[in-house]
Structure formats: structure tokens, C-alpha cells
């Protein structure tokens, strides 16, 4: 598994802090939320951020 770029982590973390109730464990839902809350035009970047947020929502505790 690859390490996510800093801009994906930074944007994802910022969105989760500002809108904690907007995200869930479903990738498709998170993808739509990221599209609504940001001005990111790139589909690939949007999906990477949504995937990062989904992964964090499914596994909130880090060891």
C-alpha cells in the first residue's frame, strides 16, 4: 500500500475536523461530500481524498 501524498492527508484531515458529521464509512457518500465541500476539479484527487477519509472513518483508532 502506497503512502498518501501530504496534500491528500492535509485536505482530508482538515475536512474531517471542520465537518465531522458530514462523513461516514461509505466511499461513494464521502466522494460526493468532498465534491460539495471543495473546489477540487480533478476526479483522481477527489477520489484519493475521499478514500483517505473513508479509511480514517472505518479505522479511527491508530495504534
Swiss-Prot record:
Keywords: Ribonucleoprotein, Ribosomal protein. It holds the Pfam family Ribosomal_S17e. GO terms for biological process: translation. The keyword Ribosomal protein applies. The keyword RNA-binding does not apply. One of its GO terms (molecular function) is structural constituent of ribosome. GO terms for cellular component: cytosol; ribonucleoprotein complex; ribosome. InterPro entries: Ribosomal_eS17, Ribosomal_eS17_CS, Ribosomal_eS17_sf. SUPFAM superfamilies: Rps17e-like (SSF116820). PANTHER family: 40S RIBOSOMAL PROTEIN S17 (PTHR10732:SF0). Belongs to the eukaryotic ribosomal protein eS17 family. This is Small ribosomal subunit protein eS17. It comes from Haloarcula marismortui (strain ATCC 43049 / DSM 3752 / JCM 8966 / VKM B-1809). The lineage of its organism: Archaea, Methanobacteriati, Methanobacteriota, Stenosarchaea group, Halobacteria.
